[in-house]
Amino acid sequence: MASSSLPNLVPLGPESLRPFTRASLAAIERRALEEEARLQRNKQMEIQETERNARSDLEAGKNLPLIYGDPPPEVIGIPLEDLDPYYSNKKTFIVLNKGKAIFRFSATPALYMLSPFSIIRRSAIKVLIHSLFSMFIMITILPNCVVMTMSDPPPWPIHVENTFTGINTFESLIKMLARGFCIDDFTFLRDPWNWLDFSVIMMAYLTEFVDLGNISALRTFRVLRALKTITVIPGLKTIVGALIQSVKKLSDVMILTVFCLSVFALVGLQLFMGNLRQKCVRWPQPFNDTNTTWYGNDTWYSNDTWNSNDTWSSNDMWNSHESMASNYTFDWDAYINDEGNFYFLEGAKDALLCGNSSDAGHCPEGYKCIKTGRNPNYGYTSHDTFSWAFLALFRLMIQDYWENLFQLTLRAAGKTYMIFFVVIIFLGSFYLINLILAVVTMAYAEQNEATLAEDQEKEEEFQQMMEKFQKQQEELEKAKADQALEGGEAGGDPAHSKDCNGSLDTSPGEKGPPRQSCSADSGVSDAMEELEEAHQKCPPWWYKCAHKVLIWNCCTPWVKFKNIIHLIVMDPFVDLGITICIVLNTLFMAMEHYPMTEHFDKVLTVGNLVFTGIFTAEMVLKLIALDPYEYFQQGWNVFDSIIVTLSWVELGLVNVKGLSVLRSFRLVRSLKLAKSWPTLNMFIRIIGNSGGGLGNLTLVLAIIVVNFSVVGMQLFGKNYKECVCKNASDCALPRWKMCDFFHSFLIVLRILCGEWIEPMWGFMEVAGQAMFLTVLLMVMVNGNLVDLDLFLALLLNPLNSDNLSASDEDGEMNNLQISSWPIKLGICFANAFLLGLLHGKILSPKDIMLSLGDPGEAGEAGEAEESAPEDEKKEPPPEDDDKDLKKDNHILNHMGLVDGTPTSIELDHLNFINNPYLTIHVPIASEESDLEMPTEEETDTFSEPEDGKKPLQPLDGNSSVCSTADYKPPEEDPEEQAEENPEGEQPEECFTEACVQRFPCLSVDISQGRGKMWWTLRRACFKIVEHHWFKTFNSSLILLNSGTLAFEDIYIEQRRVIRTILEYADKVFTYIFIMEMLLKWVAYGFKVYFTNAWCWLDFLIVDVSIISLVANWLGYSELGPIKSLRTLRALRPLRALSRFEGMRVVVNALLGAIPSIMNVLLVCLIFWVIFSIMGVNLFAAKIYYFINTTTSERFDISGVNNKSECESLIHTGQVRWLNVKVNYDNVGLGYLSLLQVATFKGWMDIMYSAVDSREQEEQPQYEVNIYMYLYFVIFIIFGSFFTINSLIRLIIVNFNQQKKKLGGKDIFMTEEQKKYYNAMKKLGSKKPQKPIPRPQNKIQGMVYDFVTKQVFDITIMILICLNMVTMMVETDDQSQLKVDILYNINMVFIIVFTGECVLKMFALRQNYFTVGWNIFDFVVVILSIVGLALSDLIQKYFVSPTLFRVIRLARIGRVLRLIRGAKGIRTLLFALMMSLPALFNIGLLLILVMFIYSIFGMSNFAYVKKESGIDDMFNFETFGNSIICLFEITTSAGWDGLLNPILNSGPPDCDPTLENPGTSVRGDCGNPSIGICFFCSYIIISFLIVVNMYIAIILENFNVATEESSDPLGEDDFEIFFEKWEKFGPDATQFIDYSRLSDFVDTLQEPLRIAKPNKIKLITLDLPMVPGDKIHCLDILFALTKEVLGDSGEMDALKETMEEKFMAANPSKVSYEPITTTLKRKQEEVCAIKIQRAYRRHLLQRSVKQASYMYRHSQDGSGDGAPEKEGLIANTMSKMYGRENGNSGVQNKGEERGSTGDAGPTMGLTPINPSDSALPPSPPPGLPLHPGVKESLV
């Protein structure tokens, strides 16, 4: 019965769970034999069948699906037959535990002894599957982990360790007994997770019983036990499996990344080898002998004549002067290696670097730049060998503390080499790192889709089962009713009408099995109940109890009182009031600062008490109104109650020390704003989701962090204590160490945050390089991969992924929106009234209501006003009005902006007043709608206005009228605008209609008189401003004008001529731009000009120039306001935005995203305010310290404990009570601190101060408050990780939304059409090339054959790689012997490559230069020879010869020719090529932003004090230096160091009266407020917006590139086709002989190849043939393409398109008319053969008749009745067998001969086999006959 209705489903319930018996095993063996026989039979018959896969829902570890019902107790824990059909012929069985989890085992004997029926094995299985067993193992793992985290364990943990080892051994033994060891499937070692157990146990016994010397490393393996949590906790294995899959996908990116890094490292090695050892060394003091003074007079020393191109690196100079100081010995090497002679900056660990080029760093007076000592950072930062260069480049690509490497390199090598870093950052860091992101994204997306598909399948199955249950229940009820009816009619005993004891009754006339009545009824009911209960959160008794206790309806007065309270509390205005209170409460808490007056402190305390009272009252009233049962059903109410309770607890414990942190819980209340703020709501849901749905991934990350923390502590803890003096002169342990678990945990977290290079230097000093690098790499790869996956899971989570500002799911307005509606109405009313006054009309309230339209639109739709069109305004019947109202609201609430076009429809509100049933539609902006976009029909229905009511469209803010690049009249459609020619347009009206109505004199008649002259003038001006010459001239002037700003640096006062030129140029530019503005006013009119954003920008910038000009004339140029106004000149380059298409596109995209970006930024600010206020509570006034101003040393806490003790010493003048510059004394500075922590720049100082803090106004103490590290850890996770990644998510989603709105034509194509279209698009641009002809000369021909062989190319590639290897082995301090050897090897390579070049030129002659790669090789060879031959000359007079060595590296580019075979890498490079145009546009915008900010920086921060990050090279003094600084900050690197000096606002930090030589500007103080705004805005614009647009574009293009590469046919397939074609068609005629077609298609590569034998296949392709039996390449390619992609209806259209493209690409193609096709040709041949055969048969029959007649005639002599009296046969037969031949024997022979067909040749016919008379010839053996062909041939 169960399976009859749904035969495709497995039998229901417990009946499908059958015990596994010996009979079951025998049945499996029988099925296995049958399957083997069947497969053998299929193999012989060449029948292919699809592979069956195991069912995913019946995998081991998953729960038994619901369709099997609740398994009875007797089948729990015993072997059962496998439910999965896949295993029906495999020796497996399953066991279920009480939790219905499936365990699968092998049915073969375990350990060769224990069969599935053995008592020992069954017992082991019962233990293994028991939930308590896994619980016990989990409980043992946790204490084991705790013991391992002890840094100095007592002796007793050794016994604990042995206990854990014993438990693990017992677990493994149980598994082996239950499963078997390793031979079959599902045995112990077949599970990779068990390898972990096995290795841990083996290591434990090894260390216990075998003496292995230093076993600390082996003991570290014990930490792997913690990974067992992954095997025990359900779901974690799946997550780890998915992670491993994503690693597999990364192989191609990793190869490309390593290749690029190697090339960049080689470039770095050649450019900067040894540079970072150049230091400033004090020049030796003068010394005399008795006769000679040899210091001061010698020109080689004088500072004036010091040759800056020489580095002092030897003692040759001293030797040359030995005779002058014969009595004095001087050890030069010892002197220059003595660190005491190096120049150190204050507080620096390494000596100051310097360089010998003009733009490198220079030494102070008395010091010289000499190459000596070790490299910076313990000697680990250098380019001296390939390995260190590779590490440096890896660090640069990861962007970890790269500003340090950047500054060191530029100081040593020169600022010109900034170009090197720009290339690495943009190509390596932004592109390759984001490619890794893109690949993992795809892997995650695929995995997500698979999971969703599986869930969908389960859901469908569940629905199917529910339907089946319901159907069965209905049938049973019907049957019972029928039975009852029959029983009643028969008057029978009702007790006998049904049997409740499970007996079966069969309906009369029904065949088949008897039907179960009562037991089936109860079974179905139980199943239904079980399915329903599965969806309930709590057990049923809980609901009964809750209804009694938690619902308060005791008496009628109480219920009435409750209803009144409900009415008040649930009012939207109360909600609004509470929201305002939350905002005010947050503001009150944010007003705390230091120092704060006592009165202000009291005000804040009272305010907080009031707010606590308000929120308590709200909670109590809601409890009364809703009852606790309803109240606690809502998450927000639970949240409220927790916060209120904690507030009261905090008030009670206010004086308890250390519990002030409880105040922080009140801050969380501001998150309640999420209730009415969708973006904040989404943000909180994302975070909640990471703890819920993504909890497993978070747990895996936590396990990895804990594991590596313990590993680090075990491996390196002892080293730190023993080798601490290597790192610190005072032998004190550093802050970052692995001596205990907490510090080790912090270091692992720091590495995961991307800060690994600084800890690495210290660790390599104490722990050795190899060991730490291994651990570090493992932490980075494992941790960052999980981290990245977690990030992507958040980023790509389906939760609101397409809808960032979605409101509640039901689409209804929330209480805040409802309550704010009247307020918005009031504001609109006031606006309309004021506008009426301006227009000279006093409007009545009714008129204002009419003019307003729908007030909801102002609040909800923003830019677009939408309401119901006239044709919808029909009066619905009263009884349906509520339903219609709901329906209409539901549809129109979700209309939004359709296709990005704002619709505007006027609503006649009089109709609404007269018709109360008319629906008011409150639209919601598109980004707030939860529904999909309406279809075209819906759009037409709801948003198409009547013709007469279409309003005048305002000018699109994205178009640039002012730029004159894309000016169109405003009322036209965008499509029409794009198509029309702007030259033929007419100017618009000058003024708006309102202005003309107000001032009638503005209306001019343009048909006559002055009006006509005015119109003519306007048209002339219009033509001028629209002319492309005017635009070009204008753009050039803007660029020149912007360029002049770059010269206004600190040296402008000294360059009088340049200054004068700039002043005159500024005036000229101002006049020209005023003229341009006036021209545009006349041409466009005020209406158009002032309704365009770009024109407003122009207008404001020109205004600033005019004001500056007037102020100069009047002599007020030195006034403060005028000076600050001049700063705004930095905005001039913004005018270039509207002139350059590429930048404008990017800006338009950004402008479209700005509302959403601002929304999320605001959310981030709300989220950060919690941490900022918390920081103020925790650290305000606690991070001051006492310092000695002369030595900059801090006083110890034992000497000076607090501020009062400090103040008693301040009178000495050499000490100071100092605060950290970036601190938590108020919320604003707290925000700045958090920004530094979030960007990981400057955060160490903030964190150290916080951790050392004690109480207010007390001296800090080293790590006294160590757990304050957790504040920063929590902020980094929630404040930095989530907020910044949400912003990235927003930008990517917004980018995709805009792309959808402005989507291309692809949207209207099917997937199949896209494939065809892409294949044709690639194919169309190709054409067969004429190959280079082989020379006639014999020797040249031989060389030609040699150089065109593939082996020759591969050999050259190998030599190129070997050449790279020889360059890699170069080091800085290599011996002379090594130098000579490498020189000779390089010489050999140059000879080889020159030889290759010469040979190719000899063989290919002038054709050599027709190939791009050959020209590339030629240039490299020439430069290599020039560099070798003229190195001395070049070094002396021109550039460094290292540049020529770098040019040799260009040869490695040839290796890229080999990547045709590497499809994955080709896809990545293809994605880069596709991204380049968009990335170029973003790069332009970034350059513009950098330019503006560098000008602004020069004008504001040029003279700040040189300290921290600002020094003699990195500053804002010149334009070049500013650009270098801003490039650094683009990745948020080093901005804290640049900001610190700008925060100096007065003495003693800086001197406001300091004179700056060469200028009139005084002082070296900064402006903190301007500095903070400058850096924060730049970081947000560049780092968060522009850089993340890079990510969006790369993700998008990588997806496109992957789609392209996954197409069956790619560009390379077509390239290979034409390459092969060149060999078969050497004359490039585009035709091939039909006879050569078979060979040609056989030489192609898959998928286009048709392997031999292919004759019949080619015939079926039906290829057109032209005279001469030739076939065109296009026809062949098209046929092969169709063969690969399959046939479809669009093929003909696509073929035409392809031919058009090919004709365009191949103008030489001769038009041809095919005369036949290959199929027709074959059919013609077959027909000819058939006709021949038929005719032969006919002749044969006649010949036989004639022969018979002749035989008879020879016997009886009768001559009558001859069949052939005359003709060919008669004559021939007569000649051969006539009477003249004599006797009959001859005739007999003739008959025999004739009968066998030998007469044929004599009659001029081909001999034929009689068997051929019926059928055409068979194909050769081995060639299958194509069925279609066979039919046509026969």
From Swiss-Prot:
Stretches of the chain found on the membrane's Extracellular side: 151-157, 211-216, 273-385, 411-417, 592-602, 657-658, 712-740, 762-772, 1048-1060, 1113-1120, 1177-1227, 1250-1266, 1370-1380, 1430-1442, 1497-1518, 1542-1571
Biased composition (Basic and acidic residues): 870-886
Repeat region (II), residues: 554-826
Reaction catalysis annotation: Na(+)(in) = Na(+)(out)
Record GO terms (molecular function): voltage-gated sodium channel activity
CDD domains recorded: Na_channel_gate
Membrane topology: Multi-pass membrane protein
Annotated compartments: Cell membrane
One Gene Ontology CC term in the entry: voltage-gated sodium channel complex
GO BP of this protein: cardiac muscle cell action potential involved in contraction; regulation of skeletal muscle contraction by action potential; sodium ion transmembrane transport
Region Disordered, annotated ranges: 486-525, 853-886, 929-989, 1776-1834
Positions of the IQ domain: 1724-1753
Transmembrane helix keyword on record: yes
Chief site of localization: membrane
Ranges annotated as spanning the membrane: 132-150, 158-178, 193-210, 217-233, 253-272, 418-438, 573-591, 603-622, 637-656, 659-676, 693-711, 773-791, 1030-1047, 1061-1079, 1094-1112, 1121-1139, 1157-1176, 1267-1288, 1352-1369, 1381-1399, 1412-1429, 1443-1459, 1479-1496, 1572-1594
Important for rapid channel inactivation, as annotated region: 1307-1309
Cystines in this chain: 280-354, 363-369, 725-731, 1550-1565
Residues of this chain annotated as glycosylated in UniProt: 214, 288, 291, 297, 303, 309, 327, 356, 1188, 1202
Similarity comment: family membership: Belongs to the sodium channel (TC 1.A.1.10) family. Nav1.4/SCN4A subfamily.
Protein's job: Pore-forming subunit of Nav1.4, a voltage-gated sodium (Nav) channel that directly mediates the depolarizing phase of action potentials in excitable membranes. Navs, also called VGSCs (voltage-gated sodium channels) or VDSCs (voltage-dependent sodium channels), operate by switching between closed and open conformations depending on the voltage difference across the membrane. In the open conformation they allow Na(+) ions to selectively pass through the pore, along their electrochemical gradient.
Subunit structure: The Nav1.4 voltage-gated sodium channel consists of an ion-conducting alpha subunit SCN4A which is functional on its own and a regulatory beta subunit SCN1B. SCN1B strongly enhances the presence of SCN4A at the cell surface. SCN1B is also required for rapid channel inactivation and recovery after inactivation. It prevents the decrease of channel activity in response to repetitive, high-frequency depolarizations.
Record note on domains: The sequence contains 4 internal repeats, each with 5 hydrophobic segments (S1, S2, S3, S5, S6) and one positively charged segment (S4). Segments S4 are probably the voltage-sensors and are characterized by a series of positively charged amino acids at every third position.
Related illness: Defects in SCN4A are the cause of periodic paralysis hyperkalemic (HYPP). HYPP is an autosomal dominant channelopathy characterized by episodic flaccid generalized muscle weakness associated with high levels of serum potassium. HYPP is frequently found in Quarter Horses, the most popular equine breed in the United States.
The name this protein goes by in its record: Sodium channel protein type 4 subunit alpha
Gene name, Swiss-Prot/TrEMBL: SCN4A
